[in-house]
A protein has these predicted regions:
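PRPP-associated nucleotide enzymes
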Residues: 1-233
Length: 233
């Protein structure tokens, strides 16, 4: 695995998601040669990862699309992810956390059904407006997964597993501006070829992705659609 940790400053704050995407794109230019970029696709995770991904794709002149995993939330705490899933049922669970919180199988089953509904809603909303990578052969291609940060890594992990299992990419790259050290260590154990991360705080210093952005406004479905349509022009 190739691992690139770009900046080591705890106080670093990105102006916004586009600024973070530009830093990642500059780093990726060193590892993806110009002639390889025609065989590369960037997949952004909605919603914030779509801004990161589209910025990278535009800078590198690559194809761009979206991939829609969903976080599985802990009971009574929507900010805490206990895992994630894809529309086909591919699931990642943080078994340690599930055990610590004594989360029942019944709760997980219902949460999966709820999140599958949201996956289908978003997929239907976005699908006719983006490059349909899911219907295209990605065998041998370089696939870049982009998000605006990885707190637990659950959505990135489940998306990576889905692509590796179903799409046979030549290379799979994870690009994230911010992720705590413990999550990076978890990602390193996955079947991923390259990780690009800008800053890695120690676990005790990390509270949320938002604290590393000056502007972390919520991204709307309309913004996602506008970005997708802009990439198709």
């Amino acid at each position: 695995m190739i691992f690139s940790h770009i900046i080591d400053r705890f106080q670093l704050k990105f102006k916004d998601r586009e600024a973070a995407g530009n830093i990642l794109a500059e780093s990726l230019k060193n590892s993806i040669k110009k002639e390889e970029r025609k065989n590369t696709i960037v997949l952004g995770i909605p919603r914030g990862g779509v801004i990161i991904g589209s910025t990278i794709a535009n800078k590198l002149s690559c194809d761009f699309g979206i991939i829609v995993p969903r976080k599985l939330h802990a009971p009574h705490n929507e900010e805490l992810g206990i895992g994630a899933l894809m529309e086909d049922g591919t699931t990642y669970l943080n078994e340690t956390l599930v055990k610590e919180l004594e989360i029942s199988p019944e709760y997980i089953k219902k949460e999966k059904l709820d999140q599958l509904e949201e996956i289908r809603r978003r997929t239907q909303l976005y699908s006719d407006k983006t490059f349909d990578w899911n219907q295209n052969d990605l065998s041998g291609k370089t696939v870049i997964l982009a998000d605006d940060g990885a707190a637990t890594g659950a959505t990135i992990i489940v998306a990576a597993r889905y692509i590796k299992t179903n799409k046979n990419p030549g290379k799979l790259i994870i690009t994230i501006p911010i992720s705590p050290k413990g999550t990076i260590n978890t990602l390193k154990n996955e079947d991923i070829d390259q990780i690009e991360v800008i800053t890695i705080p120690q676990n005790g210093n990390f509270r949320s992705i938002e604290q590393y952005y000056q502007n972390f406004d919520q991204v709307t479905d309309k913004q996602v659609i506008d970005i997708i349509e802009g990439n198709l022009e």
